[in-house]
Each structure stands twice: as C-alpha cells, then as structure tokens.
Amino acid sequence: MLDIGRPVKKPLLDDMMALARMKLVFNHNIENTSSHKELSHTAVLDVLITIEYNPRSELAREHQEEMVASHMRTAFSIPHHRSMYMDSGYPSEPFLAEAASRQMHRYGSPYMVWILRDYIRHGLADLGQKGDMVMRFFLRIAYIEAIVAEQGSTDPNFSKGCNFLTFLKALFAEGFHASVLGCQPDNNVAPPSALADMFKHAVVRFTHFARGASGCTMTTRGMVMAFLRGAAIIGQKDEKTLDIAIPILLDEKHKIEETSMSAFLIQVKRRHHASVVNAYPIDANKLGFFPKGSPADARPYVTLVAELGVKEPPSGMDHLVISQRCKRGSAHNVSQLQSKIPRNVDATERPRYGLRAFTCSDRVWKVVDPRQVEMYEQMLGVDTLLTAHPRQTEESLQLVRQMLPYWYHQPAWFSDEVTTGSPVSSNEFYEDPELNQGEGSGAEDDMQVGSPKLEESTVFEPEAKV
C-alpha cells in the first residue's frame, strides 16, 4: 500500500525494506553477497521454505540459537527444564518474507541449492522431511521466476503476486506447457474446459510457507487468510493426503473472499519405485476443502502428486502425466501423457485438474539446473548402496553382497559356487532391499521408507536405510 501511496512514503518503504534485509543477513552491505556468512544464506532460505531441523543434532540447535540472536529468528518458548533446546522459528511475517525474497533474488537460486544440500547431507535437517523441503524449494524458485517474468528483474515486488498460468510455466519444463495448460478435468465434469481457460485470470501470491496447526487451514476459508498474508500452507507432519496447499484467487478482479478461492493441492512422495497411476488421489470434497453443505459451484482446483524419489517414470509414461477423464461404455486412446485412472461421473463434482510428476530432474521441472540434477538426487536419497557403487559389473556387485551389508532371502555364501559345488544364479536370491523402499503412504513414507518384510526363508533383515 505504501508503494502506491504518496511519493514521500516510497523512500520510507525502501529504507524499511533495506533495514529488514540487513537485519536478516546480519550484514550492512546487502548487495556484497561475498561478505555474507553461510548462516545468512540459511536464514533467508529458512524464511522462504521453512527448513525442518533435525531435533537430535546439536549443531542444528546451535545454528537456530545463533539465528535467534542475529538473524531475526523468533524464540517462541523455552521449555520449563531450560535445557537442550528452545522452540524457535520464523513466523508468518509478510514484510520479512518480502525482504527474504528480494535477498534470495540477489543471491540466485543455484547457490541456495548448495545450502539446502549441505544441511541435508550433514544431518542438520530432518531427513524424514527432505522430500517436502525440496518440493517447497522448487515452488519458491518457480514463484520468483514467474514474478521476474511479469515484472522484470529490476526491483521486483514479490508480494504483488503473479498469474497462475505464468507460475505453472515457470515450474514445469517447456515441453509440457501445452499438455498442462490444455488438460481437461479428470472427474468427468460437464462441460469440460481446458485448464488455461478456467485459470486465465487466476492469481497466486505466496512469499513464504506457514505450517497449518489443524485441518481448518486446509479449506477455502483458510486460503483467504493465507492469500492475504502471502503464504502457502504446509500440512501437518502426520497428514497422509495433502502436504502443501497454495491459495489461488480465481479472478483478480473479484473480492478476496471464500467464494473466490481455490488452491493448488500438492502431495509429495519420496519412494524409490513409482506407484500405480491411480495411487494417492487428492479429492478436495473428501478433504473438506470446500464448505460442507454448500451447493456445488464451478470452482476448479489443481492437484499434483510429485514422486521425486524415482529415477525414471513407469514404463510407457512420460515424466509428467496428465490425468485423463474416461467415458463410460466406450473405448479411448491413452497417450504416454495420459493416465488410465477410471473416474465416476458426478454432476455435482467440481472440476479437478490432476497432474503427476516423476523424478527430480530438469526433464520435468524447469526450475532444476541440468548440472544440479545429481545434487537433488543425493538430497533425496535416490541412490542406493548398490546403484551408487562405482563398478556396476555383476562380479563387483556380488563381491559387495558377499560382505553382507544386508541379510537377503538367502545369504551370499549359500549361492557361492565354492560352498554349493555348482554355480547358482545370484539373481535367484539377491534382491536389494533399498530398491523396494516406500510401501507406506503419507508422512510414514518419509520417516521410515519401506521397512523390509520378514519372510519364512529370512533369518533376519534389518531396516533399509533412509
């Protein structure tokens, strides 16, 4: 508001913004980024994506305490025993989030990837939440790029918001733009309309992420408050269906009220194997996202299931799958960009545009630098003990197996020609447990990725590492 007010107010706003940036990075020279400490970059990143810290890491606690002292982090509470830790964080503060957005634009996203990677690699971040953090990083970079695309790179105002279609084009690789913008509702809403037509006047506005305290935040009423504060909502850690909700104002000319709101609903998975195409459906009606008892209206919404942990999409599918509605009693052709999810016709259903993305590579995400794909895979733990081994010959892999890093269905010595007297195919017995991670769903997928199952022929089989 100050930006469009009296001329004397604009210099005051600029001075306040510069002060916020200086206090956030704890440095008077906000433009000379080479003089900034690594913790300055961490503070900026924390404001924007909400880093989940490892509660067992002493170094992580020290970093949080230093950010409370010098980088605008808020100490919420000190437990009554006054030992070990304090409860702290960056609350939803729009002005500070705008300052952090401008500072991150100054730093550049490639360098910030290193900060996030180091926190995950050194155990400072909560490993169970690293998939969600990477996804939030993708969304923040896409939002920054969309703002720059609409406003230019000189002094952009990130709190202004941007067109939802511009945001989608900044998020997904160019090869999928036509498919995403032209996709149809996957729940047989009549008459169907393309996503680009339904959201051509829609606006997204989120300069930071805020964790929802209860399910009431994941509603259209909650989206009103989130949009006003410029925040996207993070689901609770035990939420199994929804991880992130980005508020959408469907028409920039309408009032910001409940009847004008929708959302981009996202679920993040870090499984090493891609799930079936109809797994993890996101149904806004079942989630209670829209008001109960209200008549169905034409408000559309978009869903995304991001399977970041897989290295390749399922056979016959591309890296981005568009859910395709099916007509009853008639055959239809399904391309590699269309899923085979059967849908029931419901005249009261709101239009749902379903997307499913596989891998963390630049082939699906425009915000990913091709030179940093391997870094993202390392962050997400895509490589396993055997797949990351430098020598991928069967002889070398068998030598690794013989060191018994895991107990398999049959131990290594049992299939060895020396003990059996005849060669036995190792493929008959060996199965890398790390390649079968992620049989659960929701938060459990991240905290404990696919605990191996005990079988009758198995003596002992420890948990696969995350």
What are these regions (language model features)?
Residues M1-V466:
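Charge-enriched interaction surfaces
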